Amino acid sequence: MDPWISTQPSLSLDLRVGLPATAAVAMVKPKVLVEEDFFHQQPLKKDPEVAALEAELKRMGAENRQLSEMLAAVAAKYEALQSQFSDMVTASANNGGGGGNNQSSTSEGGSVSPSRKRKSESLDDSPPPPPPPHPHAAPHHMHVMPGAAAAGYADQTECTSGEPCKRIREECKPKISKLYVHADPSDLSLVVKDGYQWRKYGQKVTKDNPCPRAYFRCSFAPACPVKKKVQRSAEDNTILVATYEGEHNHGQPPPPLQSAAQNSDGSGKSAGKPPHAPAAAPPAPVVPHRQHEPVVVNGEQQAAAASEMIRRNLAEQMAMTLTRDPSFKAALVTALSGRILELSPTKD
C-alpha cells in the first residue's frame, strides 16, 4: 500500500461546505416517538346544563315516537270507520229502505250492532218535526212571513230514510221564523211586542244595513233557548224585521186582564171629557148579575194562572242559583248526612 493513501484522513464527502461546526450540530435534532392511547382516554367532563338538555331531548324524542304511534292507530281506526260508513251509505242508496240497508250490510260481510239497527229504525219511523210556532198574541198589524217558515220546515223534512245522518244534522239546526212589524221610523227602541218577555243583551251595525240590529233573549223562563234579532228593513224604514231562532219550552204568558184595561180606558175617557160631558153620557146598561159572573170567574182564573206561572219560574230561578253555589251543596250534604245518622237505628 502506498504511503500517501494511509496518511489520507478520510474519504467521506461532506456537503457542509463553509459552515461552522456548531451550526452543523445545531441542525441535527433528535427524533422522539410519542405514543398516544386513543382507546383508553378519560371521558371529557360535560356541563350539567348540557347533560340536562340531552336528557330532555331524549325524553321528547320518546314522547314524539309514542304520539306518532297513537296518531297512526287513530288514523287507521278512522279509515276503517269511514269505509264502513261509505259501505252503509252505498247499500242504503241502492236498496232505498231501512230493512234493505241492514240486510245488504250484513250480506256484504259488515257487522252492524243491534243498537245501530234500532237507532236507524227509530229515525226512519219517527214522524217529521212540527213546524216552528208563531206568536199568536201579536197585534193586528203584525204579519208572519210564510215563506221563511215554510222553507225552514221543508229543509228539515226533506230527507230520505236512507240518509239518517243528514236528518240528524237538519234536526240539530235551530228553527228560524221571521216577523214583520210596522213601526214609526223615529222610534229607535227596536221593540217588537209579541206577547213574550225579552231581555236585550246586545246591539251592533251590520254591513248590509245601516240600521242597527238588536239582540234579545227570552227571559220568561230561565232555560228558554229562544233568541230574537230585530232590525229595520233596508228597503223600508217603517218595517221592523224580527228573526226568531229556536222554540219556546214554556207556554205563552197570559195577557193582561181585560177588565183592568176596560177600567183604565173608562177612567181615561172620563178624565179627558169636559165638565159638561157627564150630562150627555149614556147611562150604563142594566144587565142581570148572572151575566157578569162568568167574566169574573175568567178573570180570576187568568190571574191564578199568571201567579202560578210566575211562582214556578221564580222557583226555577232560585233552584238554579242555589245549585250553582258550592257552599249550598256542602251544606245540603251535611244536613242530609246528619238527618240520616239521626234516623238510623243506634246499636246498644
From Swiss-Prot:
Signal sequence interval, chain numbering: none
GO function terms (MF aspect): DNA-binding transcription factor activity; promoter-specific chromatin binding; sequence-specific DNA binding
Region feature (Disordered): 91-141, 246-287
UniProt KW keywords: Coiled coil, DNA-binding, Gibberellin signaling pathway, Nucleus, Plant defense, Repressor, Transcription, Transcription regulation
Pfam families the record matches: WRKY
Stated induction or repression of this protein's expression: Induced by biotic elicitors (e.g. fungal chitin oligosaccharide and fungal cerebroside elicitors) and pathogen infection (e.g. the compatible pathogenic fungus M.grisea race 007, M.grisea crabgrass BR29). Accumulates in response to M.oryzae. Triggered by defense signaling molecules, such as salicylic acid (SA), methyl jasmonate (MeJA), 1-aminocyclo-propane-1-carboxylic acid (ACC), wounding and pathogen infection (e.g. X.oryzae). Repressed by gibberellic acid (GA) (at protein level). Induced by abscisic acid (ABA) in aleurone cells, roots and leaves.
Species assigned in the record: Oryza sativa subsp. indica (Rice)
Chain residues forming the annotated DNA-binding region: 187-253
Database matches in Gene3D superfamilies: WRKY domain (2.20.25.80)
Subcellular localization: Nucleus
Chief place where the protein resides: nucleus
UniProt feature, compositional bias: Low complexity: 102-114
SMART domains per record: WRKY
Motif (Nuclear localization signal): 116-122
Quaternary structure and partners: Interacts with WRKY51; this interaction promotes W box binding of the complex WRKY51/WRKY71 in a zinc ion-dependent manner.
Family note: Belongs to the WRKY group II-a family.
One GO CC annotation: nucleus
Record-linked InterPro entries: WRKY_dom, WRKY_dom_sf, WRKY_plant
UniProt tissue specificity: Highly expressed in aleurone cells. In seeds, predominantly present in the plumule, radicle and scutellum of the embryo. Expressed in roots, stems, young leaves and spikelets.
Protein name as it appears in the record: WRKY transcription factor WRKY71
